[in-house]
């Protein structure tokens, strides 16, 4: 017997398996201000008590494993273990529970979303004792928030760079998303920007394919930006997508965008990964580039109500990792997004301090201290008739992005941009005059049609378009 084994045996080590709840279920635990708090929706397998299921989550996402190990005696488990300190039954669900877990801050590397997620949502999601598991929310303590740079610039700095205030920003995703040559792509960018949009965007599907290599696209888009700026007197931008197969290639594209003098680049933070995203965000801050974030792949992770990670958690992770814009759903368009839930995570993106509010799905009070805010981007199946609702729902600090709702205009791209800009200006003016956009929205748009034939044509095309489907992810009643 080795000396280490003898020493361990002498202090009472007992090999074997014991229930997780004996160590990790600690209802008497008082969460510390420095703890990371998590709310999990737990669906145990039949026969597994909820206390044991919740404790298993705390164990397997912190210091625990399936059996006792003698090396437990070489550290302080009470200092490092996760604490499942509260559990509550989900209203209206027989076999679902919300388990609250507190994680000591020393479990996590400073400034690393990658490490935080690897621990909290790692192997535990495949645990056999659980039928399903969903991370509903995280409370990130200020002590941990302060280890992150966060967004490269934030809302106020972006407005100052663009010299645009008092209204939402307008964007457009270039369509068709795939197949255009670089020159034709640049032409569409120019026409949309000249027509009155603030931004155009690479579709998330666009990278560097045989029909359009990234360098060619960057050059033609830069030409379109400068030409439209000269003609309109407004600062313009195009989200040049830097996402690539390697981090080195991603950075090369960002460097080229900076050399062209364009104001903004784009990244897919979920498919590209948190490490790559954080690296790009640091580069963007150091070099004066805004960073637009797309959430491609999010619905694979967040759409099902009983399993995965809620988007409010992914939104918090993005604010920590870094991004100046992120797509957040529209409430009224073609993509999933219930109003109260959407407004909850929009506040988590923009505000410095957000109170707990279960009516909007916010499980914890979140203090972002000095971390800059992120502009939510409403995009997906929206058109001019949606403008009053979008302006009322998202307010000024947002980006309203119309792809088909610009490029599908019967008269072409520039008139489509004009229609959207006129509709937005009409809604902002009406709101500033005290009119109710929710009740008078259609009337406001019809009035604006009288002095904008471009808007009138757009209204005629999309007057019957609705996306009236029940949301999959809704609040517990």
From Swiss-Prot:
Its EC number is 4.1.1.39. The modification N6-carboxylysine is found at residue 201. It is found in: Plastid, Chloroplast. Its main location: plastid. The keyword Magnesium applies. Its cofactor is Mg(2+). The record marks 334 as: Transition state stabilizer. The disulfide bond which can form in the large chain dimeric partners within the hexadecamer appears to be associated with oxidative stress and protein turnover. Binds 1 Mg(2+) ion per subunit. Mg(2+) binds at residues 201, 203-204. The modification N6,N6,N6-trimethyllysine is found at residue 14. RuBisCO catalyzes two reactions: the carboxylation of D-ribulose 1,5-bisphosphate, the primary event in carbon dioxide fixation, as well as the oxidative fragmentation of the pentose substrate in the photorespiration process. Both reactions occur simultaneously and in competition at the same active site. The basic functional RuBisCO is composed of a large chain homodimer in a 'head-to-tail' conformation. In form I RuBisCO this homodimer is arranged in a barrel-like tetramer with the small subunits forming a tetrameric 'cap' on each end of the 'barrel'. This is Ribulose bisphosphate carboxylase large chain.
């Amino acid at each position: 017997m080795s000396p280490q084994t003898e020493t361990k045996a002498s202090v009472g080590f007992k090999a074997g398996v014991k229930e997780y709840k004996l160590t990790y279920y600690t209802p008497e635990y008082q969460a510390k201000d420095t703890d990371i708090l998590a709310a999990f929706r737990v669906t145990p397998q039949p026969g597994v008590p909820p206390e044991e299921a919740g404790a298993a989550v705390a164990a397997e996402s912190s210091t625990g494993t399936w059996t006792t190990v003698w090396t437990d005696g070489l550290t302080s488990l009470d200092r490092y273990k996760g604490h499942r300190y509260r559990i509550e039954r989900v209203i209206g669900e027989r076999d679902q529970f919300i388990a609250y877990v507190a994680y000591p801050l020393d479990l996590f590397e400073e400034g690393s979303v990658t490490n935080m997620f690897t621990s909290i949502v790692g192997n535990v999601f495949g645990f056999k004792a659980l039928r399903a598991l969903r991370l509903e929310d995280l409370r990130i303590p200020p002590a941990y928030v302060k280890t992150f740079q966060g967004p490269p610039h934030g809302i106020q700095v972006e407005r100052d760079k663009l010299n645009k205030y008092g209204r939402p920003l307008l964007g457009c995703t270039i369509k068709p998303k795939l197949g255009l040559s670089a020159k034709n792509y640049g032409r569409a960018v120019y026409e949309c920007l000249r027509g009155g949009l603030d931004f155009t965007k690479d579709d998330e599907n666009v990278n560097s394919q045989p029909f359009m290599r990234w360098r060619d696209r960057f050059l033609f888009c830069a030409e379109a930006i400068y030409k439209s700026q000269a003609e309109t007197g407004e600062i313009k931008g195009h989200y040049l997508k830097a996402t690539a197969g390697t981090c080195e290639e991603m950075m090369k594209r960002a460097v080229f965008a900076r050399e062209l003098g364009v104001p903004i680049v784009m990244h897919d933070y979920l498919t590209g990964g948190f490490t790559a995203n954080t690296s790009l965000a640091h580069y963007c801050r150091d070099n004066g580039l805004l960073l637009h974030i797309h959430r491609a792949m999010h619905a694979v992770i967040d759409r099902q109500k009983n399993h995965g990670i809620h988007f409010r958690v992914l939104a918090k992770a993005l604010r920590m990792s870094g991004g100046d814009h992120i797509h957040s759903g529209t409430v009224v368009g073609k993509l999933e997004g219930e109003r109260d839930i959407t407004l909850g995570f929009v506040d988590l993106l923009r505000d410095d301090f957000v109170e707990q509010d279960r009516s909007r799905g916010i499980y914890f009070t979140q203090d972002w201290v000095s971390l800059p805010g992120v502009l939510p981007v409403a995009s997906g199946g929206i058109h001019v008739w949606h403008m009053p609702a979008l302006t009322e729902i998202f307010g000024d600090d947002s980006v309203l992005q119309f792809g088909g709702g610009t490029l599908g205009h019967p008269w072409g791209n520039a008139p489509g941009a004009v229609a959207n800009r006129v509709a937005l200006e009409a809604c902002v003016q009406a709101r500033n005059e005290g009119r109710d956009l929710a009740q008078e929205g259609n009337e406001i748009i019809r009035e604006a049609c009288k002095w904008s034939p471009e808007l009138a044509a757009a209204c005629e095309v999309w007057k019957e378009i609705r996306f009236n489907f029940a949301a999959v992810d809704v609040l517990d009643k």
